[in-house]
Amino acid sequence: MISIDQRAMQAKPIDLEHLSAQDTALEIRNLDLSYGDKQALFNVSMKIPKKQVTAFIGPSGCGKSTLLRCINRMNDLVDSCKIKGEILLHGQNIYDKKVDVAALRRNVGMVFQRPNPFPKSIYENVVYGLRLQGLNNRRDLDEAAERSLRGAAIWDEVKDRLHDNAFGLSGGQQQRLVIARAIAIEPEVLLLDEPTSALDPISTLTIEELITELKDKYTVVIVTHNMQQAARVSDQTAFMYMGELVEYADTNTIFTTPRKRKTEDYITGRYG
């Protein structure tokens, strides 16, 4: 079995089945999703705790990224996508017709596999979302930029070149810049879709350390193909297979004493 970070082993596991409303960031209820005639998610239900890191793992094509993109309605951009079920944020179904999708995406930020800074300065990348919200006071923008860059553990590396083009940063720095941009508008939830898959090992470690710090302020949900990464950074892990949620428990349980045979087979490398 995969070794677990000692900090994760020392933490008391959360009772996910009886998680209270005040400790729940998101609740997914009986979620089905299909693209045209092909069903990609089958009756997924789970509660995601506040200010914890929850990892989605599973083989390619299992539905983990599809599920992640449901949480801020990115799948709305796919014309053939049909969804049944609910995802509750503050007790409200985010798929309710009355929901302001733009406001939802401000509250549920997302970072993708490859760093995607805008062709602007480092500073303008960070404050971009704030400007869209109508914030133009220079002092407020400066404070927000520094706060966000510090929060993404990159301030010391860029503080003397904030007006340089963001494309001049390394891949790992660009990804931290993108995280800074996401947290600048102070979301409650941060979705990370394979955030280190395009990075070198040193940059990956830096991002992993950042993820464990981010949960002090945000609920973090990460999709990863790297099981060692899930074991290192997450508090809970959900194992998905062929569109179904097979097992969801504290990370220590998933990686050391899984309850389901499919989970054990995947963790031990029998398939995947």
From Swiss-Prot:
Positions bound to ATP: G58, P59, S60, G61, C62, G63, K64, S65
Cited PROSITE patterns: ABC_TRANSPORTER_1, ABC_TRANSPORTER_2, PSTB
GO cellular component: plasma membrane
Localization annotation: Cell inner membrane
InterPro entries attached to this UniProt entry: AAA+_ATPase, ABC_transporter-like_ATP-bd, ABC_transporter-like_CS, P-loop_NTPase, PstB-like
Similarity field: Belongs to the ABC transporter superfamily. Phosphate importer (TC 3.A.1.7) family.
Subunit structure: The complex is composed of two ATP-binding proteins (PstB), two transmembrane proteins (PstC and PstA) and a solute-binding protein (PstS).
Stretches that traverse the bilayer: none
Catalytic reaction annotation: phosphate(out) + ATP + H2O = ADP + 2 phosphate(in) + H(+)
Record key words, sorted: ATP-binding, Cell inner membrane, Cell membrane, Membrane, Nucleotide-binding, Phosphate transport, Translocase, Transport
CDD domains for this protein: ABC_PstB_phosphate_transporter
Protein name: Phosphate import ATP-binding protein PstB
